[in-house]
Curated annotation (Swiss-Prot):
Its EC number is 6.3.4.19. This is tRNA(Ile)-lysidine synthase. It is found in: Cytoplasm. The keyword tRNA processing applies. The lineage of its organism: Bacteria, Thermotogati, Thermotogota, Thermotogae, Thermotogales. GO terms for biological process: tRNA modification. Disulfide bonds: none annotated. Its main location: cytoplasm.
């Protein structure tokens, strides 16, 4: 059977954007509504051309009285069409009540969890979602009203990991015409007209009002969406460009912002925060922007995550307690917070000191106002380009009466030369070597 104009356009979208490849298994998220029923029928008609296999999945959210009707409808339809369908029930109202979240948010989370699990368990490559251009408009408006950044504008994509949206750039009226023209049955979700749901209010109140200003609202928003995607792609290239300047150091992610502009710094801050599972809000971003020209500072992002700046370095880190002091005695390995030392008879690293008398040697944190040879340790760390957020974690190696070594900052000359019975305290592992080595040529090694 030849393709009609709409089906051909969907095929071209799939081929142009490489949504489905030969041999792929595709799972259609089938609610039974107009959009998902049209998507299922189009993919069934295209499956031979695409050389793919089509499945369907339906989750009964147990929210509406007619949910059983919808479940039975999609099951019966797929059985007649020869399509394998996966059907499950999930008590979304209880799920939302237990987690104190809204019905819309909870239903979406439950649905995606279900779809991903079905795909994984059955070796299915792609999940096909029936979002259309009107859905895109409504979602962007919803995100803007809630307060969003770039990610909110590019909230839906034609392809997003294992999810595809072949109908994303088609208007709802095109889908309605296709359904009517082909006599495709569907069920109507009566809650789509309930204005207590935010998306319905946007659909039935906000969008019609905006169309009085621009009758071609959908295409206007698709242009905004396209621009957002171009900017997002630029940010991805930016992250790749500076990937060698981003370091994961224990419970920190640190990046070197030297010679970066404000836009680049903020995008890297957002990226690194995201790697720590923190989504920066507008207020936090504005606060970071306001402090960019300051040399050192700290901002709490959550109860256990903070962002700190020292010189050109930014650190997004988990808050944690650190060891204050560690005694060094017999030869062996010593761990001081994230630093690893070894006391042995041999030089085993580039960073080391000779220990002439093992008695009374310890590794500790610096003390407030502490001086070495009359110079404040803080000033020495500043001269050595140690970022402020690392200074309290720098190990200070002491004997009973003097500081003999602060790695990357100071070494007492008397402990740089071996004596007859000396042992060697080697720095084996330094979690911040990637940062400290960057400015090594600028450091003052001895006093």
């Amino acid at each position: 059977m030849p393709l009609d104009e709409f089906e051909f356009s969907v095929l071209k979208t799939i081929q142009t954007h490489h949504l489905i490849f030969p041999g792929h298994k595709v799972l259609v998220a089938l609610s039974g509504g107009m959009d998902s029923m049209s998507l299922l029928n189009i993919l069934l008609k295209l499956r031979q051309k695409l050389n793919c296999e089509i499945f369907a999945a339906h989750l009964n959210h147990m929210i509406r009285e007619n949910a059983i009707r919808d479940e039975q409808f999609v099951y019966s339809y797929c059985k007649k069409a020869g399509v394998k369908i996966f059907v499950e029930r999930f008590d979304v109202p209880k799920f939302c009540a237990d987690r104190k979240i809204g019905i819309e948010e909870g239903a979406r989370a439950a649905r995606y969890t279900f779809l991903n699990r079905i795909a994984h368990e059955n070796g299915i490559d792609l999940i096909a979602l029936a979002h259309n251009l009107n859905d895109l408009v409504e979602t962007i408006l919803y995100r803007i009203v809630r307060g969003t950044g770039l990610s909110g504008i590019v909230c839906m994509k034609l392809k997003d990991e294992n999810k595809i949206r072949p109908l994303l750039y088609f208007k709802r009226e095109q889908i309605e015409a296709y359904i009517k023209r082909n006599n495709i049955p569907y069920v109507q979700d009566e809650t789509n007209f309930n204005l207590k749901y935010s998306r319905n209010y946007i659909r039935h109140r906000i969008v019609p009002a905006l169309k009085l200003l621009n009758s071609d609202l959908e295409n206007a928003f698709s242009q905004v969406h396209f621009s957002g995607m171009m900017l997002e792609n630029h940010v991805k290239r930016l992250i790749k460009k500076y990937s060698e300047r981003i370091f994961r150091c224990g419970k920190r992610i640190i990046f070197d912002s030297k010679d970066m502009d404000e836009f680049e710094i903020i995008e890297l801050v957002k990226y690194c925060a995201g790697q720590m599972n923190v989504d920066l809000n507008y207020r936090q971003i504005q606060l970071v922007v306001s402090k960019l020209n300051e040399n050192s500072w700290s901002i709490d992002l959550s109860e256990d995550i903070a962002i700190k700046k020292g010189f050109d370095f930014f650190s997004i880190e988990k808050k944690c307690k650190f060891m204050n002091i560690l005694k060094v005695g017999k030869p062996g390995v010593y761990k001081f917070n994230d630093w690893t030392f070894e006391l042995s008879s041999e030089v085993k690293s580039n960073e080391y000191v000779f220990i002439h008398d093992q008695g009374g040697v310890c590794i500790r944190k610096r003390k407030a106002g502490e001086k070495i040879a009359g110079v404040k340790m803080k000033d020495m760390m500043i001269d050595s380009k140690i970022p402020a957020f690392l200074r309290d974690e720098m190990p200070v190696v002491c004997t009973i009466d003097r500081i003999i070594w602060v790695p990357y900052v100071y070494v007492d000359r008397c402990f740089k030369e071996r004596k007859e019975d000396s042992l060697v305290l080697n720095l084996l592992q330094n979690p911040y070597s990637c940062i400290l080595e960057l400015r090594k040529d600028e450091r003052r090694k001895m006093v």
